[in-house]
Amino acid sequence: MGGCCAGQGRGSMQLFWKKADGSGKAALVAGFYFTCSISMNFLNKAVVSSYEFNYPFFIMSCQMVVTVVVLDIFRILKLIKLPAYSLKDGVDFLPCSLSFALHSTLSLIALHGMNIPMYGAIKRCTPLVNLILSVVLLKKAFPSVLLGSSVGVITMGALVASLGDFQFDLHAYTMGGLSVLAQAAYLTLVQRTSELHHRSTVEMLHVNSFNTLPIFLTVSMVVGEPAKIGMSLAAAAPGFTPVFALLIFSGCVLTWSQFMCAAVCSALTTSMISVAKSVIQTVLGFFTFGGVKFHPLNITGPSHILNPHSSYILQV
């Protein structure tokens, strides 16, 4: 009886998804991604800084292991339609996986030396890079004047906000800037793989996890993270274990929702959602984890997002 009800539930969800029109699907996916991503930076900050557990390669390795194990269990139980991993699929998706690995690691490093509001400000440069890549790599039409100006003003807001950061850390800002380039690259490649090769989100997520797991594990051992973790007192700290487990689980779900948003909507839309999310993140960041000292430029920069983002929504 339980299996029958579960099957009927999955069938109902699949039927609902098939009947939803293009704009309806896009709205659902965008909302899901927004919901998943809103808390991730705070979880990262809690684990990396508050608990002094700054081992980004180990953290990403754990997320990839959980993703691979869960998806393979679902595949074996035939709960999802998913082909087994193959070397050919891995090689085909390797450029995207390398960009993903670079972005994930650099983001965690940047967060360790940068407060959350300023990290969000730097990430607002991603739509500009996505806009350029959509023309160069995806061969899309040149953006309209309204769209181009919207993205340009958002990027300018990020630069203005950075001028008000009294705790400027060149290394952290460099890592944040490089993570922007890497994120724009892998989102664009996910969109291209979905459009040209018709790969499902779950397939791309599965292959990506297999591809990046050896990278994260190897680098983690090279930089000596296992030995440092063995001497770390973080695991014994009150509340660390559930927060760390939540970070790993949320990271897996976030990656899935992000891949799905890039495939169903677009890479540019995905990065614009991240920008919208960063407004809330910036406000909350002033009051959490030490926040950042108030400066008019810190408010002026993020406020640039409102009108340009509304213009983008009207166009899509």
Indicate residue ranges for each PLM-predicted region:
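Polytopic endomembrane small-metabolite transporters, centered on the Drug/Metabolite Transporter
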Residues: M1-V316
